[in-house]
Amino acid sequence: MSAVQKSSKSPRGRVSAGLLMFRRKTDEFEVLLVHPGGPFFAKKDEGAWTIPKGEAAPGEDLLMRAQIEFEEELGIQLSGDWIPLGWIKQKGGKIVHAWAFEGGLLEWFKLKSNMFELEWPPRSGKLKKFPEIDQAVFFSEELARRKINPAQVPFLDRLRAALNH
């Protein structure tokens, strides 16, 4: 594991940290991606999935934030040998730092996501609760490349390189 990385402000002030769980399948690997909940992503699939992640406060330990977010979003406590995947910049300017680790979900796994409130429908004055994530699925590397937010594809490339090293 590399030295502790701390959050700093990106150009738009948003920095996130996340974890990419993978499992080996013969000569390939599968990765766990999550689908954002709420009405804006309800009918979106390809390009909408993401690694489990969350925003870090300035100066916060990024790997610790990534672990906290993973546990909050998926209800899974974890530990592992972390593979640093570096960072990417998403379309909106957010910087995302990521680490990968090998793991799996138990048969009895049931998604337990945090909830958020949103005025829905817009300008209705009604607040409705939605899950932060509504699905968590293991995808083959090939399918993950189509499902994941395009800006996060380099994380898959870096994981592939680390596993082939």
Language-model features, listed with the residues they occupy:
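Active-site-adjacent beta-strand/loop module that shapes the phosphate/pyrophosphate-binding cleft
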Residues: 87-125, 137, 159
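Non-DNA-binding regulatory cores of transcription-related proteins
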Residues: 128-134
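Short, charged/polar surface micro-motifs in flexible loops or helix N-caps
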Residues: 25-28, 38-41, 57-58, 92-93, ...
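Short, solvent-exposed loop/turn elements at beta->coil junctions and helix N-caps
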Residues: 6-7, 84-90
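Charged phosphate-binding loop/patch that engages nucleotide di/tri-phosphates or the phosphate backbone
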Residues: 137, 141-165
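N-terminal strand-loop-strand
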Residues: 2-51, 99
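The catalytic Nudix box helix
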Residues: 50-85, 140
